[in-house]
Amino acid sequence: MSRPPPTGKMPGAPETAPGDGAGASRQRKLEALIRDPRSPINVESLLDGLNSLVLDLDFPALRKNKNIDNFLNRYEKIVKKIRGLQMKAEDYDVVKVIGRGAFGEVQLVRHKASQKVYAMKLLSKFEMIKRSDSAFFWEERDIMAFANSPWVVQLFYAFQDDRYLYMVMEYMPGGDLVNLMSNYDVPEKWAKFYTAEVVLALDAIHSMGLIHRDVKPDNMLLDKHGHLKLADFGTCMKMDETGMVHCDTAVGTPDYISPEVLKSQGGDGFYGRECDWWSVGVFLYEMLVGDTPFYADSLVGTYSKIMDHKNSLCFPEDAEISKHAKNLICAFLTDREVRLGRNGVEEIRQHPFFKNDQWHWDNIRETAAPVVPELSSDIDSSNFDDIEDDKGDVETFPIPKAFVGNQLPFIGFTYYRENLLLSDSPSCRETDSIQSRKNEESQEIQKKLYTLEEHLSNEMQAKEELEQKCKSVNTRLEKTAKELEEEITLRKSVESALRQLEREKALLQHKNAEYQRKADHEADKKRNLENDVNSLKDQLEDLKKRNQNSQISTEKVNQLQRQLDETNALLRTESDTAARLRKTQAESSKQIQQLESNNRDLQDKNCLLETAKLKLEKEFINLQSALESERRDRTHGSEIINDLQGRICGLEEDLKNGKILLAKVELEKRQLQERFTDLEKEKSNMEIDMTYQLKVIQQSLEQEEAEHKATKARLADKNKIYESIEEAKSEAMKEMEKKLLEERTLKQKVENLLLEAEKRCSLLDCDLKQSQQKINELLKQKDVLNEDVRNLTLKIEQETQKRCLTQNDLKMQTQQVNTLKMSEKQLKQENNHLMEMKMNLEKQNAELRKERQDADGQMKELQDQLEAEQYFSTLYKTQVRELKEECEEKTKLGKELQQKKQELQDERDSLAAQLEITLTKADSEQLARSIAEEQYSDLEKEKIMKELEIKEMMARHKQELTEKDATIASLEETNRTLTSDVANLANEKEELNNKLKDVQEQLSRLKDEEISAAAIKAQFEKQLLTERTLKTQAVNKLAEIMNRKEPVKRGNDTDVRRKEKENRKLHMELKSEREKLTQQMIKYQKELNEMQAQIAEESQIRIELQMTLDSKDSDIEQLRSQLQALHIGLDSSSIGSGPGDAEADDGFPESRLEGWLSLPVRNNTKKFGWVKKYVIVSSKKILFYDSEQDKEQSNPYMVLDIDKLFHVRPVTQTDVYRADAKEIPRIFQILYANEGESKKEQEFPVEPVGEKSNYICHKGHEFIPTLYHFPTNCEACMKPLWHMFKPPPALECRRCHIKCHKDHMDKKEEIIAPCKVYYDISTAKNLLLLANSTEEQQKWVSRLVKKIPKKPPAPDPFARSSPRTSMKIQQNQSIRRPSRQLAPNKPS
């Protein structure tokens, strides 16, 4: 008879108990991983994972999946409870927003429970996932959480919700160093302090194996005591073993970025920590000078200066910077191979710039800071800028239709500095100690329990037989599962094909909508153009009406003519694009139809597969029910066996526990022995070290004594040398006489120089007279110009004829416009027709979907009926299968399944036929049921027989139990003996503990000895220091004796006295001569300064006169045009001229352009400031006035020659990256020659010119390689030229500022236009102007472009030099921020 299978262990299960030694150690390791806050699977990470899964799955579309729905039902409530218990944003009161960035904002908050103040940083999850390469928050969190450095801003808590990440940091009320530099003029003493703190802070970051890469004053915050801490570690990067970093993108702020980091954007991204020291050099320069060393208005200008730093780095003459400070800045701002700090921070610390009496490197944080912030309360935010409220809508994740995992990238972000979860409690410690005692007590049990293993072997054989039976059942199950998996994979492949087609369909629909949008856009453009044409017609009619009273200039007509031509050209292009759009729309509609047909086919296939799947699922359910019935029978039979085997299992567990206890006690014994040996080794090592250190100190003392004796011997030698020096004094007297002669010659030279200066002054007087003569000549020219006015009236008659021709052209253009209108109407009709077609298709699609849903509903009803009938039939079949052979049953089942498949396929054709088939099937099932009932009676008979057999088995097992009771009694006796052995072991353990205490006492003695040795060492070091000081004092004393003058005993005393008298006389003469010379020099210097000031004043007066003359010329021009208009009006009224009269010339009112524009002012390094000026453009000059009163008084601020204009263009964000983004559409740039400018005084520093070798010359351009992180397009191919993180290589001309892809140059494409600006850069200037609106900007640009001369102006070698050179602040002078009175230092 075969034994029934047991329900105990599965095959292949380990025989050892779960509480053995190896298992416990694994559990402890696992517990350590969970407790470790740096571990990726710590408690907070696990909770984050569960929370994220629930948030990502809790959507209606995903809940349709049964497994997901079960998961959410199980964990949704507990996760909500966890969220309520964890830290959240509602635990804090927001005081104020103190900062805002691209990913979120920084808030000043107060914790409701503790009332502590923090700075809380919010990062939007949506924004970070939307932008690629934005996992910067991990580095920032880890550095602030685990740095434990006083130079790094600390992170207290990090938590998250479904929309934001939150970082609760310490609040730094002193603000950043940008605020400090804008409020104070930073002296060198302060700069020394803050630079030292930055160096120490960066050294702390570097020691963690990281490079900051964005060191700037914005990221340097001051605490309440005024000391510095670093912040914003989003750009930090881990160094490799060599201390280097590999990165292909330029990271950092333009003004502070190093040349090697800039080069990395080309692909050579290989640099080390030295890039941070470059930024420190820029920061130090900015503190001392008030501006960054490589400042430029454009991004390209800044980058070109950084790359050419050897030539572009210069110090202002008016800035008070010490030699050591300049040396340090130059040492930082050099090539990375020789940069200071490359070999370690000690290089920087030893630099003489940092020598001072107030602090040293070890105690700098304990000393008083230069500026201690004055705080009114703990929430004082006066040192931060006021941030406007963000009223924009916050973007969130859209509701997904499939699993997206938006919360998964943020798992593990949560962090608490005071982590109380799973902390070691006293109860845990007590249980651990009890467990260890128990383990120690059962050491010896293992030896005596080996005999019991023989008794258990018989039982294991029976168990193996049962396991084999289980395996056979499992193989059958696996076969059925494989068949199911094959069907599922087939279905998945079809579904994926369906999804692909749906995607293609969606793409085509999107393209169709895009083309439709473009067509609408083109139609709008067309309407605008028509409106423009109508407005132009209206303007023409107005002009005709005005001509009846007065003649108007022809330039207006020419301008209108040009505009008409442009509109015609635009209309033609619009019509072409509309035709193209029509074609593409037709093609897309065809593709949509094809896709819809494919979609229908796939949906049919999907229906077939779903029916097949349902059949397979039903079969699987039947098989499972059969399996369950088999398992019930098995469990019923095995319950009896389990009762019998329960006691055996208990004995097995006792045996295994005994083994575990034994192994643990042995391990502890070994560990104690090893620890004892280690302590003895440490003791011996300590003794050796102490003896060695004592020997070293003694040797150093002996060396010092030897050196002391040597110095004494040297001093004796020097005394002898001193006596020989006295003899050489007579020779020194002769040298003094020679010096006197040289002084006299110098005096003569100075007098000659003064004569030359007087000659120059006389020449300048002549120049003044010549300038006055020129003014008289200009007045004469004015009279000549009045005569020219009369001649211009003759030209007007010629212009009347031209006007008639333009009117005829206008008529022709109106006809063309009408034809274009007709074509547009046709396009609209066709478009409407296409839209109707699209609507019909969508309706048909909706109807088909409804029909499919109805059919699915009917199918489900039929399937429910089938399942109900099949349930009854399967119950009977399962009872029959238990007694019949499995092979026969499977063949029958296969036949039945095939019949069902055919029936289900027939059901799809017609629902009525399916109902009939199901009825006939039910009749056949009833017949089968009656047969099964007959077979059931036979089974009951067999069941009675089986019960009798089980009773016999019970009797046998009772006998076996009595035998096993006897064995248990014997085992209990052995257990008693084992307990006595355990007691003995406990005594041994106590002895070992006593030994351990002795060892610990020895260790403490050793430590005391070590402390005493350290004290002796300190004493010796003090003695050494005193010896050194005595030595230096002796050397200094000897040097003093050496330099002291003593009368020489030997030789003739009278000769010496005589020579001394002569010497004194010569000294007196020398002094008198020097005094005379200095007086004369002071006198002549005063005269020279007065003359120079007079020249400067005269030149300034000359410039002002020239400027007033220019403004008067423009006034004369305006008056002349008005006079001309009056003459024309009189002529027209007398002659009675028609609408075709002449209009004015280029110099008359219509060509005159005037209005308010703003010029840039450098108030701050970070942003532009603007000053309004009233600007007038005449035929020859562009005049800038401070106000309208200055205009009336003819007192211009600046004048530019129109002949010297090179180029006028609107700017982009990269040209003026310091300006506000809203202002960019209103800014335009003027390029002009240097000599074409007259100005009252200098306000903008001239940028120094770099070497030409850094530029790529092509078609007159001078291209600079760069990268754009702001929105910019290529002006050659009009494709995007920018990317936020990985922009493509680009070029920008430093003359005309055209931007293009570098590939166009590399591939030698001819699409780049030639440079519009041909001039020498050394004589060229550019000027930025801000209009009141974008329309005004366009008007100014279009009008000024027409004024540019066709041939570029040649620089005039005899022309006057730029007035900037006369009255300007020199090129390298500093522009310091507006300062306020320095606050006195306060003790921290």
From Swiss-Prot:
Residues 1362-1376 have a biased composition (Polar residues). GO terms for cellular component: centrosome; cytoplasm; cytoplasmic ribonucleoprotein granule; cytoskeleton; cytosol; nucleus; plasma membrane. It catalyses: L-seryl-[protein] + ATP = O-phospho-L-seryl-[protein] + ADP + H(+); L-threonyl-[protein] + ATP = O-phospho-L-threonyl-[protein] + ADP + H(+). It is an enzyme of class 2 (transferase). GO terms for biological process: actin cytoskeleton organization; actomyosin structure organization; aortic valve morphogenesis; blood vessel diameter maintenance; cellular response to acetylcholine; cellular response to testosterone stimulus; centrosome duplication; cortical actin cytoskeleton organization. It is a peripheral membrane protein. Residues 357-425 form the AGC-kinase C-terminal domain. Residues 429-1024, 1053-1131 form a coiled coil. The modification Phosphothreonine is found at residues 414, 1212. Phosphorylation at Tyr-722 reduces its binding to RHOA and is crucial for focal adhesion dynamics. Dephosphorylation by PTPN11 stimulates its RHOA binding activity. The modification Phosphotyrosine is found at residue 722. The record marks 1131-1132 as: Cleavage. Residues 1150-1349 form the PH domain. ATP binds at residues 98-106, 121. Residues 92-354 form the Protein kinase domain. Residues 497-573 form the REM-1 domain. Its main location: cytoplasm. This is Rho-associated protein kinase 2. Residues 979-1047 are annotated as: RHOA binding. Residues 1-27, 1345-1388 are annotated as: Disordered. InterPro entries: AGC-kinase_C, C1-like_sf, HR1_rho-bd, Kinase-like_dom_sf, PE/DAG-bd, PH-like_dom_sf, PH_domain, Prot_kinase_dom. It comes from Homo sapiens (Human). Keywords: ATP-binding, Biological rhythms, Cell membrane, Coiled coil, Cytoplasm, Cytoskeleton, Kinase, Magnesium, Membrane, Metal-binding, Nucleotide-binding, Nucleus, Phosphoprotein, Serine/threonine-protein kinase, Transferase, Zinc, Zinc-finger. A zinc finger (Phorbol-ester/DAG-type) spans 1260-1315. The active site is at 214 (proton acceptor). Residues 373-420 are annotated as: Interaction with NPM1.
